[in-house]
């Protein structure tokens, strides 16, 4: 068997396993019913939504997002993620979408000084094709996903993935983030222009709804890569 064929077969098996696991986990999850997995985007003409403490966030509807340990995509990285819930809000200001995430995290892990240290993080994910039929776990070769990944060490990355282990950084000059360490956790705002080039990820311009998924990493718990807390199913942004 050729290497390329073998890799495709292994990828297909992993995707099938992930889909089956996600279906079972979602059915067992004590999360919001499908009708409630919706976040209404607050549209404003102007103003500052970049700061987690901006006044506009007091007006934006809040979603209570349940998280669970992700499918173990890497056999060498296993464990149980700690974060079980986060709140999510969204604001459209001009030509940008701002997403605000807040969650509890007892320790602030903001730098890596040794090989056994990892930083806190969070991410939102969109299907590039805008369809909720896309696999919520990192997509697949035919249906990629776009990830906005914030890290507590100050890095914010725009990624495109086509399945487990395929997350690839792609240029996105307009992707920005602002984070605040609170008494008991993190508050983070990630934003990006609605319209982007095809190679930059999911284009949000002109959409009335958009599937969105969430993730969090607790560095103190050795969480990194595929060891993370995630949503089992897509949520929906309503513009």
UniProtKB/Swiss-Prot annotation:
Gene3D superfamilies: 2.60.40.1190. Heme b binds at residues 74, 138. It comes from the Bacteria. It is found in: Periplasm. The keyword Magnesium does not apply. Its main location: periplasm. Its EC number is 1.97.1.9. It catalyses: selenite + 2 Fe(III)-[cytochrome c] + H2O = 2 Fe(II)-[cytochrome] + selenate + 2 H(+). Keywords: Electron transport, Heme, Iron, Metal-binding, Oxidoreductase, Periplasm, Signal, Transport. Has potential use in bioremediation of waste sites contaminated with selenate, such as agricultural drainage waters. Optimum pH is 6.0. Activity is also optimum at pH 6.0 in the presence of tungsten. CDD domains: DOMON_EBDH. Binds 1 heme b (iron(II)-protoporphyrin IX) group per subunit. Its cofactor is heme b. NCBIfam families: DMSO_red_II_gam. Component of the selenate reductase, which catalyzes the reduction of selenate to selenite and allows anaerobic growth with selenate as the sole terminal electron acceptor. A c-type di-heme cytochrome of the cytc4 family was shown to donate electrons to the selenate reductase in vitro. SerABC can also use reduced benzyl viologen or reduced methyl viologen as an electron donor. This subunit accepts electrons from either a quinol-cytochrome c oxidoreductase (QCR) or a quinol dehydrogenase (QDH) via a soluble c-type cytochrome, and transfers the electrons to the iron-sulfur clusters of SerB. This is Selenate reductase subunit gamma. It comes from Thauera selenatis. The lineage of its organism: Bacteria, Pseudomonadati, Pseudomonadota, Betaproteobacteria, Rhodocyclales.
């Amino acid at each position: 068997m050729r290497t390329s064929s073998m890799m495709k077969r292994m990828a297909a098996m992993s995707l099938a396993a992930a889909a089956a696991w996600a279906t079972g986990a979602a059915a067992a999850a004590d999360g919001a019913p499908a009708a409630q997995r919706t976040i209404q985007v607050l549209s404003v003409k102007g103003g500052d939504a970049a700061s987690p403490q901006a006044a506009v966030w007091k007006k934006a509807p809040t979603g209570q997002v349940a998280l669970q340990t992700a499918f173990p995509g890497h056999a060498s990285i296993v464990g149980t993620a700690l974060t079980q819930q986060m709140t999510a809000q969204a604001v459209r200001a001009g030509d940008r979408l701002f997403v605000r995430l807040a969650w509890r995290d007892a320790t602030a892990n903001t730098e890596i000084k040794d090989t056994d240290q990892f930083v806190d993080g969070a991410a939102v994910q969109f299907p590039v094709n805008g369809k909720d039929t896309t696999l919520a776990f990192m997509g697949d070769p035919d249906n990629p996903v776009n990830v906005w990944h914030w890290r507590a060490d100050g890095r914010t990355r725009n990624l495109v993935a086509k399945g487990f282990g395929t997350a690839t950084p792609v240029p996105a000059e307009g992707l920005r983030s602002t984070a605040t360490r609170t008494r008991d956790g993190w508050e983070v705002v990630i934003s990006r222009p609605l319209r982007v080039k095809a190679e930059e990820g999911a284009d949000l311009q002109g959409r009335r709804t958009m599937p969105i998924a969430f993730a969090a990493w607790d560095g103190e718990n050795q969480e990194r890569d595929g060891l993370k807390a995630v949503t089992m199913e897509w949520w929906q942004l309503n513009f």
